[in-house]
């Protein structure tokens, strides 16, 4: 399980996240802030627009139909995760791992999760430069890496 350390995602939802793997339906599961009926704190409009754009761009290159590529809540079968060499940190991680997973052609599920987004006054760190880095990583790991 990968979970951002800022607790915007609820650890009590691990059973929801890993259920498709435990039931032998999935190799990888993404928690989606944009699916399902779980509670979501309403925060920044432009973050949602940026996330939607990055997810769309990633989907174009990976041929996936994710709703939330940038989620910080993911689960993997051990063999899948161990086969990935991670190069990025910060906000380049999600586009990198999504591109590398897509090339492996595993069974991917998304599950609806809750989200308690933080404000900048509460320590939120992401900014426009992180979005630019994510775009760079989408191109880098989909076009120039095996």
PLM regions: where:
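Secondary-structure boundary/capping motif
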Residues: 9, 77-80, 105-107, 137, ...
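Acceptor/aglycone-binding surface of glycosyltransferases and processive sugar-polymer synthases
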Residues: 11-91, 117-128, 132-135
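Generic structural signal for secondary-structure transition and capping sites
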Residues: 26, 86-89, 106, 140, ...
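Catalytic donor-sugar/metal-binding loop of nucleotide-sugar-dependent glycosyltransferases
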Residues: 64-65, 87-89, 98-116
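Short-chain dehydrogenase/reductase
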Residues: 94
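Basic/Trp-rich segment in TM-proximal cytosolic loops or flexible interdomain/linker regions
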Residues: 132-146
